[in-house]
């Protein structure tokens, strides 16, 4: 039972059993998806869930709470959504991080996963199990989820509802309307630039931009369109928590091979050809890639004897991984999607 601070969502009978069943379904579906794609070996087919960073130390934030509708699940690769949620909590604002990304019929309707330091991760079962990156919430589902969220609010009026994905547009509008609070859209990606995203998502996002009280953008290109329709646009680039990246203690010994590496998703935007060319041009260098393989073309790199893929690593291991590199890469293809990014991995490498 979570009964601390600004939110109260008591556990219900069978919640734990449903959570276990939902996780088992996730693993099974992920394994089938990978095997159908032709990847070899059951171990590599099973999807890995990288542990998310722990919530902030226990505290009692006194500011008005924030309703946070993020771009990724709390347990996904640690990036801007999780960093910003932690920063808001540490700044004294209780945060309700609504996690509706696990697509399972077996989940409890809602369950609080974390309740430390003013950060509350509320996992919710989304009726109909829509794909959050390709299918926006409909009005009826948004209304049902609004009632669930409002039922757990205690006393203080929230500071704002923050939306990071067009998927949440209807829910964000409904919460803002019911509570009479500002609607803030944090535009962190060119969403329609991702493979398979339908054009209608652009229409949903355009309305969200028009109706938001404030639009934040991580990069200049992402701020251009909002500025055409609203003066309330803030360029808010990414950054890095320097405390999490202490200066490395060891210095590379003379004569040891140069180590080149990358941390992040190995998706369609990853320039496989450029990395392969570099690997062939410098056969005495070692290349290390840390991240989930999301593009089958990455398999072509397996033929390089001086390159290894180490898989997804927890955020806690990123500083030591980067400290072991002589050169950090951000090898993105020239795409509309990549022209609009402000890569967190660049800040982390420079830290």
Model-derived segments and spans:
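Nucleotide-activated donor-binding/catalytic signature segment of Leloir-type glycosyltransferases, i.e.
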Residues: 296-322
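Membrane-proximal helix-turn-helix segments that form the acceptor-binding/catalytic region
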Residues: 84, 148-149, 174, 198-215
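Glycosyltransferase donor-sugar binding loop
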Residues: 286-298
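N-terminal subdomain of nucleotide-sugar transferases
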Residues: 5-8, 23-109, 280-282
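Carbohydrate-associated surface elements
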Residues: 221, 236-248
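Nucleotide-sugar-dependent
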Residues: 75-79, 270, 314-321, 326-351
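Conserved donor-binding/catalytic core segment of Leloir-type glycosyltransferases
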Residues: 253-270, 275-282, 288-290
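A short, active-site helix/loop in glycosyltransferases that binds the activated sugar's phosphate group
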Residues: 193, 211-235
């Amino acid at each position: 039972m979570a009964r601390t601070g600004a939110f109260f969502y008591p556990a219900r009978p069978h919640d734990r059993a449903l959570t276990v069943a939902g996780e088992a379904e996730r693993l099974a579906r992920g394994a089938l998806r990978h095997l159908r794609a032709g990847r070899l070996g059951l171990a590599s087919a099973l999807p890995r869930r990288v542990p998310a960073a722990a919530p902030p130390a226990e505290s009692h934030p006194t500011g008005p709470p924030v309703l946070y509708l993020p771009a990724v699940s709390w347990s996904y690769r640690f990036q801007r959504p999780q960093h910003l949620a932690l920063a808001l909590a540490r700044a004294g604002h209780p945060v309700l991080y609504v996690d509706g990304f696990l697509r399972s019929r077996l989940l409890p309707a809602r369950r609080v996963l974390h309740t430390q330091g003013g950060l509350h991760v509320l996992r919710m079962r989304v009726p109909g199990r829509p794909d959050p990156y390709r299918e926006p919430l409909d009005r009826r589902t948004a209304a049902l989820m609004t009632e669930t969220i409002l039922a757990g609010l205690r006393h203080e009026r929230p500071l704002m509802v923050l939306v990071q994905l067009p998927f949440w547009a209807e829910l964000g509008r409904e919460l803002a309307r019911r509570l009479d609070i500002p609607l803030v859209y944090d535009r962190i990606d060119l969403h329609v630039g991702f493979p398979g995203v339908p054009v209608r998502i652009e229409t949903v996002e355009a309305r969200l931009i028009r109706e938001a009280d404030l639009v934040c953008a991580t990069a200049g290109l992402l701020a251009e369109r909002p500025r055409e329709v609203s003066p309330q646009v803030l360029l808010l680039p990414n950054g890095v928590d320097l405390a999490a990246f202490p200066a490395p203690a060891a210095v590379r010994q003379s004569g040891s091979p140069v180590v080149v590496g990358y941390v992040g998703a190995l998706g369609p935007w990853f320039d496989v050809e450029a990395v392969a060319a570099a690997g062939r041009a410098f056969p005495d260098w070692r290349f290390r890639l840390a991240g989930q393989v999301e593009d089958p073309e990455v398999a072509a790199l397996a033929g390089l004897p001086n390159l290894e893929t180490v898989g997804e690593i927890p955020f806690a291991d990123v500083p030591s991984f980067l400290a072991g590199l002589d050169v950090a890469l951000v090898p993105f293809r020239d795409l509309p999607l990549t022209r609009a990014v402000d890569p967190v991995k660049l800040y982390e490498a420079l830290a």
